[in-house]
Amino acid sequence: MTTTTTTSSPIILIAGHWLGAWAWEDVLDHLATDRSRTVAMTLPGLDADDPERATRTLEDQVAAVLDVLARLGASAEEPATIVAHSGANGPVSLVLDCRPELVHRVVWVDSGPVATGSAFAPDLPDGLEELPLPSLDLLAQQASLDGLSAEVLARFRARAVPEPGPVLRQPVVLTNDARRSVPTTLVCCSIPGAQVLELARDGHAMFAEVTTLEHLDVVDLPTGHWPMWSRPRDLAEVIRSAAARTS
């Protein structure tokens, strides 16, 4: 069988807390795009083999994303699509702030843009260098595990890397309103899109920034917080469609 490759912008896939490039393996199997122009990346601080990983910062993560954009040849004439899951929204919001012209479209996967001044865990004790993946019972209180088998959860536990403390404590400082003009796809999984928009209009801290976006598409993909494992084929289709959009 011959696989048809879709023409699209370059694509960068960035998973959230505790995850690396490996989290996108199932999606990549279904993403019929040019593999030379599609990169699943591991953010600094989430490489288990990095002896300095607990000291990595948001600045390190932003620099790494910009480096991948450069390697893909992203430019104002040929910008890339960035797919950001969950807690990857901090560094990706900063990338949109500093180089919006390099981004064709941002796809937030059960995630969204952060507001300036926000931090994921500002009260994290100074003596805590990193935050390991919590127990599944606690994790389920924080995010939906719907659609994840025992096998998938075991793999998550085995491969998860503790999140570096500096990344969790640092506030995200944004100054460039041009970030809001980047075309955006909001993939709503654990909370329906209509509810997300209502929360945004009500000024909910987690979603308020959504109301400032100039070009927004909302896609409902009902499942848990990790759709790259529970609905990889469907998520791949959403990503492929977003990357191929011309406006």
PLM region spans:
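Conserved loop-alpha-helix segment in the C-terminal half of the alpha/beta-hydrolase fold
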Residues: 193-222, 234-242
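Active-site glycine-rich loops that stabilize anionic/oxyanionic intermediates
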Residues: 16-19, 86
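Active-site loop/oxyanion-hole signature of alpha/beta-hydrolase fold enzymes
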Residues: 43-81, 97, 121-126
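Serine-hydrolase catalytic-loop signature spanning alpha/beta hydrolases and amidase-signature enzymes
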Residues: 18-26, 38
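Conserved alpha/beta-hydrolase
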Residues: 28-52
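Active-site nucleophile elbow and catalytic-triad environment of alpha/beta-hydrolase enzymes
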Residues: 158-177
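Flexible "cap/lid" loop of the alpha/beta hydrolase fold
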Residues: 97-98, 102-103, 107-142, 202-203
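Gly/Ala-rich beta-loop-alpha elbow adjacent to hydrolase catalytic centers
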Residues: 83-92
